[in-house]
Swiss-Prot record:
Cellular component, GO annotation: ribonucleoprotein complex; ribosome
PANTHER family: 60S RIBOSOMAL PROTEIN L10
Keyword terms: Ribonucleoprotein, Ribosomal protein
Pfam families to which the protein is assigned, alphabetical: Ribosomal_L16 (PF00252)
Gene Ontology MF terms: structural constituent of ribosome
Stated family: Belongs to the universal ribosomal protein uL16 family.
Keyword hit for Ribonucleoprotein: yes
Protein's name in the database: Large ribosomal subunit protein uL16
Record bears the keyword Protein transport: no
GO biological process: translation
Length: 172
């Protein structure tokens, strides 16, 4: 089946749907790595990507943003020159009431009768001003980290803001 556009799931409309204990067939998350780079070093500058609006971010968008930011940081600073953390987890289970299309679909499908839907994906529910990504770097890689977060923000379905959490005096 074709993947639906993210605009179908972006807005938070209903109550949370996370109890996997009662569900069968929940697809696994594509996001596997939540800590990237050098996890042991202590970096003086921390930059964070914040969501400006309340929304749901699908696990595919989180993985695309993570890959983009990680690739930009790895090529510029190397594996040991940064630490990046993904701060949200896709707990929310998304459902879809599949519709049959084409000739004879009216005989096959039941329309809106029993329209609860099947589990198709997972998403992270994000509130306004919540941290999504944090990158810790040395001051010489600050511009690269900021650009990596900007690129990652373009993959997400909400407007984002980049703020410096720690080390503002070093990057002026």
């Amino acid at each position: 089946m074709v993947r639906k556009p993210a605009s179908m799931y972006r807005n938070v409309k209903s109550r949370s749907f996370t109890r996997r204990k009662y569900m069968g067939g929940v697809p696994g998350s594509q996001v596997i790595h939540f800590d990237m780079g050098n996890k042991t070093a202590d970096f003086p500058v921390k930059i964070t990507l914040l969501a400006d609006e309340r929304c749901q971010i699908r696990h595919t968008a989180l993985e695309a943003a993570r890959i983009t930011a990680n690739r930009a940081m790895t090529t510029a600073a190397g594996r040991s020159g940064f630490h990046m953390k993904l701060r949200v987890y896709p707990h929310e289970v998304l459902r879809e009431n599949k519709q049959a299309t084409g000739a004879g679909a009216d005989r096959v499908s039941s329309g809106m009768r029993a329209a609860y839907g099947k589990n198709v994906s997972t998403a992270a529910r994000v509130s306004a001003r919540q941290k999504i990504f944090t990158i810790s770097v040395n001051k010489e890689h600050f511009i690269i980290a900021k650009d990596a977060l900007r690129r990652a923000g373009q993959k997400l379905p909400t407007p984002v803001t980049i703020v410096v959490d720690q080390g503002q005096e070093l990057v002026r």
